[in-house]
Amino acid sequence: MPTINQLVRKGRYVEEYKSTAPALQKGMNTLRKKATDISAPQKRGVCTSVKTVTPKKPNSALRKVARVRLTNGIEVTAYIPGIGHNLQEHSVVLIRGGRVKDLPGVRYHIVRGALDTAGVANRQQSRSKYGAKKPKAAKK
C-alpha cells in the first residue's frame, strides 16, 4: 500500500490495453499511403509463402502456416486449420485473430471456405468452423 507522499510523487497509472491481434487494428489509406486506426474483425490478404513449421517442446507435428501480406501492408504469419488445404503463393485469403498456442509468432487464423480458401472436405462435425457444406442426404 503506497503512502500519500508516494502517490503525490508518482501517482497511479492506468495499464494500457495491448491487442492480441495488432494487425487487425490498423487500416491503410491507399490514396495517401498512410496507416489509419481502423479496427476490423477480419482482413483480406495475399499469401506470400505457404510452409510447415514444427511446434514448441512437448508437441510434435508439421503445422501448416502461411505468410500473408494484408491489405494494410502488414505481413503476418497465419495458421491454416483443418486437414488438407488448397493454398499456394498468391492465393487471396481472409484472416481472423486467434493464436496457436504451440506455434510462437502465429497470432492469426485463416478462415476456411472464404475467398480462395476451400472448406475442409468430408467434414461432418463443427462444419461452420471449417467452411464445409452440409452433406446431401443419402438416397434409400
Curated annotation (Swiss-Prot):
UniProt biased composition (Basic residues): 130-140
SUPFAM superfamilies xref list: Nucleic acid-binding proteins
GO biological process: translation
Annotated positions of the 3-methylthioaspartic acid modification: 102
A GO term, aspect molecular function: tRNA binding
Keyword RNA-binding in record: yes
Protein name: Small ribosomal subunit protein uS12
Source organism (scientific name): Alkaliphilus oremlandii (strain OhILAs) (Clostridium oremlandii (strain OhILAs))
